[in-house]
Amino acid sequence: MGRGKLEIRKIENKTNRQVTFSKRRNGIMKKAQELTVLCDAKVSLLMISSTHKLHHYLSPGVSLKKMYDEYQKIEGVDLWRKQWERMQEQHRKVLELNSLLRREISRRMGGDLEGLTLVELSALQQEMEEAIIQIRNKKYHTIKNQTGTTRKKIKNLEERHTDLVMELEAKFRGPQFAIGEDDPRNYEAAAAAAVYGNDVAAANLFALSRHPIT
């Protein structure tokens, strides 16, 4: 009993689909090689699978460009003309946009004003005035932020300075560090504490007594 006719339709199972593609791809490649050898034909074969993998075959000594050129020559068509025309149109639009932007920049710098009507000049003036207002507001905002940051730094330094002064006052508040300029005994006691006590605070106090800060 012969085999039934295989219905040609998409294979839904991905694994089966890939297996079938590989088998039939190899068969087509083999047929293309046979046509090249047996019939001295120029064969170009391109295949892209459902997984977006490219498979191709070209007869020995033949390039894809040569095949395209020969096809265009035989058929009398230009495969690239529409693409070239599209690229030319895009290039023209880019040049026009570039020229327009250069002219707008020049006008905002006070140049290329010839030919503008009174309405156009008034509109340009209004745009420039609005731009100046935005720039001024941005400048004031930046100055305000920087001023606030500087004030915070100054406040922190002042608080640190106050803490240091309070620490020094607490350290020198004891009677052993009291200095009386009119009492030589207090002066000698501070000097002795600085020399023999090896105390940094006492040494500083002694130095201040000799060279007071005014």
Swiss-Prot record:
<dbReference type="GO" id="GO:0003700">
    <property type="term" value="F:DNA-binding transcription factor activity"/>
</dbReference>
<feature type="domain" description="K-box">
    <location>
        <begin position="84"/>
        <end position="174"/>
    </location>
</feature>
<dbReference type="GO" id="GO:0046983">
    <property type="term" value="F:protein dimerization activity"/>
</dbReference>
<dbReference type="InterPro" id="IPR002100">
    <property type="entry name" value="TF_MADSbox"/>
</dbReference>
<feature type="domain" description="MADS-box">
    <location>
        <begin position="3"/>
        <end position="58"/>
    </location>
</feature>
<dbReference type="InterPro" id="IPR002487">
    <property type="entry name" value="TF_Kbox"/>
</dbReference>
<dbReference type="InterPro" id="IPR036879">
    <property type="entry name" value="TF_MADSbox_sf"/>
</dbReference>
<keyword id="KW-0238">DNA-binding</keyword>
<keyword id="KW-0805">Transcription regulation</keyword>
<dbReference type="InterPro" id="IPR050142">
    <property type="entry name" value="MADS-box/MEF2_TF"/>
</dbReference>
<dbReference type="GO" id="GO:0005634">
    <property type="term" value="C:nucleus"/>
</dbReference>
<dbReference type="Pfam" id="PF01486">
    <property type="entry name" value="K-box"/>
</dbReference>
<dbReference type="GO" id="GO:0000977">
    <property type="term" value="F:RNA polymerase II transcription regulatory region sequence-specific DNA binding"/>
</dbReference>
<keyword id="KW-0804">Transcription</keyword>
<dbReference type="Pfam" id="PF00319">
    <property type="entry name" value="SRF-TF"/>
</dbReference>
<dbReference type="InterPro" id="IPR033896">
    <property type="entry name" value="MEF2-like_N"/>
</dbReference>
<dbReference type="GO" id="GO:0045944">
    <property type="term" value="P:positive regulation of transcription by RNA polymerase II"/>
</dbReference>
<keyword id="KW-0539">Nucleus</keyword>
<protein>
    <recommendedName>
        <fullName>MADS-box protein CMB2</fullName>
    </recommendedName>
</protein>
